[in-house]
UniProtKB/Swiss-Prot annotation:
Task performed by this protein: Dermonecrotic toxins cleave the phosphodiester linkage between the phosphate and headgroup of certain phospholipids (sphingolipid and lysolipid substrates), forming an alcohol (often choline) and a cyclic phosphate. This toxin acts on sphingomyelin (SM). It may also act on ceramide phosphoethanolamine (CPE), lysophosphatidylcholine (LPC) and lysophosphatidylethanolamine (LPE), but not on lysophosphatidylserine (LPS), and lysophosphatidylglycerol (LPG). It acts by transphosphatidylation, releasing exclusively cyclic phosphate products as second products.
Enzyme type, top EC level: lyase
Name of this chain's protein: Dermonecrotic toxin LhSicTox-alphaIA2aiii
GO cellular component, one term: extracellular region
Cofactor note: Binds 1 Mg(2+) ion per subunit.
UniProt-listed Enzyme Commission number(s): 4.6.1.-
Tissues of expression: Expressed by the venom gland.
Length: 270
């Protein structure tokens, strides 16, 4: 589910069939995660202005992903944080990672004490901001919770050349837990050339990519094209449309929604 920035939308998208949501994170001048907010412009047909304070959103998300909680949504298993680091200077990336880790540890993971169970993908728009990853991972280790890194994956969302993305991960010291996004706003069309390149890297056996997702997919035809190209996931404003296509004869025996028992970091072998 794309652009889930208000707490009530967590339920809304999960009830439409989403097993994963994407949430925008904006930062203040000191690299603190501040709001879950996208702003104008955004996808056609959507309100761009929904928001929460980031820490409040994390608490709402924790409720939705903690078994036994009255707000628990059992099929919600993955959250992509679309980190709007474009407002920061490059030299603030590491600091943003540190602060993100502390916020998640306290408000989402409940300091490691029966917090939310969803897997988290940190999605970074700029390859130059790769130090955010080390800031994040080092902080979780320093805070005594390296085990939570098992729950965390990474994505560079700038549609950069696949080779350049690989280099950024090398600099960040990341091997594994890598999702590769490709896409564009639903207001515009984008072909599947780079998606196919990413899928080939994933399936090569020696590439850096574990999973590939395509965004924003709102139409049945685009959903079919993406599934045919071999993606692991799609981001959509209409989870019910995706569910309909997955139930079509051509797909219902080939693809299914991932559950909590499926690892988001292990490349699926056909």
């Amino acid at each position: 589910g794309h652009m889930v920035n208000a707490i009530y939308q967590i339920d809304e998208f999960a009830n439409l069939g989403a097993n994963s949501i994407e949430t925008d994170v904006s930062f203040d001048d000191n690299a603190n995660p501040e709001y879950t907010y996208h702003g104008i412009p955004c996808d056609c047909g959507r309100s761009c202005l929904k928001w929460e304070n980031y820490n409040d959103f994390l608490k709402g998300l924790r409720s939705a992903t903690t078994p036994g909680n009255s707000k628990y949504q059992s099929k919600l298993i993955l959250v992509v944080f679309d980190l709007k680091t474009g407002s920061l200077y490059d030299n603030q990336a590491s600091e943003a990672g540190k602060k993100l880790a502390k916020n998640l540890l306290k408000h989402y993971w409940n300091n490691g004490n029966n917090g939310g169970r969803a897997y988290i993908v940190l999605s970074i728009p700029d390859l130059n901001h790769y130090p955010l990853i080390k800031g994040f991972t080092d902080t979780l280790k320093q805070e005594g919770h390296p085990e939570l890194l098992e729950k965390v994956g990474y994505d560079f969302s700038g549609n950069d050349a696949v080779g350049d993305v690989a280099k950024a991960y090398k600099k960040a010291g990341v091997s594994g837990h890598v999702w590769q996004s490709d896409g564009i706003t639903n207001c515009l069309l984008r072909g599947l050339t780079r998606v196919k390149e990413a899928v080939a890297n994933r399936d090569s056996g020696n590439g850096y990519i574990n999973k590939v997702y395509y965004w924003t997919v709102d139409k049945r035809a685009t959903t079919r094209d993406a599934l045919d190209a071999g993606v692991d996931g799609v981001m959509t404003n209409y989870p019910d449309v995706i569910a309909d296509v997955m139930n079509e004869a051509a797909y219902k025996n080939k693809v299914r929604l991932a559950t909590y028992e499926d690892s988001p970091w292990v490349t699926f072998k056909k």
